[in-house]
């Protein structure tokens, strides 16, 4: 008889829940709920389990915020809860709450060739560290290492490291954003809001007044080639994505590959392919040769957060992935 566990991927707007076959890791019956419609994450879980008429004893839910102890307070939502209390209320024998990029990193060993698009480099080296990052509402970062037949995710808040410009144009962008924001992190340029920041800084540096655009509008105008400033912003976004990925590769020697997740890049995939992304990735001066062979992959799996939550739970329960 198939034994299922609950898995979830929760962001600032939506909560996506599904079932994971504990034997195979297969994800099924995924459903998305608006977080605004429910008073708590526990309430969403109860609705899901009731709708699907299923009883589970284990669960793993990935959330887009730091997880540092029993108390979880979401960054972009009002939900806050005790993991132990939620586990007790739901009657679970085991409940894991993990960072969203912990889940994405744990999905990587489960991905198949059709879930990936490669951008340069050679083949990954088995057993070597892996990096994963992704731009969305913010900039998520994690690393993954293989130790004693177990995958160990190393989450953090790498999206909040300093934005490090490496060209005259990027330096001008930094000065414009510093005057407006104070500290300028990588997330301030590598995210949906970050794309708008790039556009605004480009326009303001030319002494003009920027329009009040949304990230989608910047992307659409860039792809339609109807706005030079938007096209410059999107081009610069791709280059800086490359630089940041190259920095991750240098930091931990990620010869197992660098993986890009998040919902932004797939929206302009052809533009990204033709951009200066890989050039930015390899632009490491004396260490260009070090990163040249490191492959970069775009994850195109529909639900890497759910897949990785299931993988994390299965490994925690004693399975070898």
Curated annotation (Swiss-Prot):
Q: What class of enzyme is it?
A: transferase
- Where does the protein end up? Cytoplasm
Superkingdom to which the source organism belongs: Bacteria
Which reaction equation describes what this protein catalyses? D-glucose + ATP = D-glucose 6-phosphate + ADP + H(+)
This entry's Gene Ontology molecular function terms read: ATP binding; D-glucose binding; glucokinase activity
Q: Which keywords belong to this entry?
A: ATP-binding, Cytoplasm, Glycolysis, Kinase, Nucleotide-binding, Transferase
Q: Where does ATP bind?
A: 8-13
- Please report any disulfide bonds recorded for this protein chain, giving both cysteine positions: none
Pfam families xrefs: Glucokinase
Q: Name one GO biological process term.
A: glycolytic process
Q: Give the enzyme's EC designation.
A: 2.7.1.2
GO cellular component assignments? cytosol
Q: Which family does it belong to?
A: Belongs to the bacterial glucokinase family.
Per its UniProt record, what HAMAP family does this chain match?
A: Glucokinase (MF_00524)
Protein's name according to its UniProt entry: Glucokinase
Which species does this protein come from?
A: Klebsiella pneumoniae (strain 342)
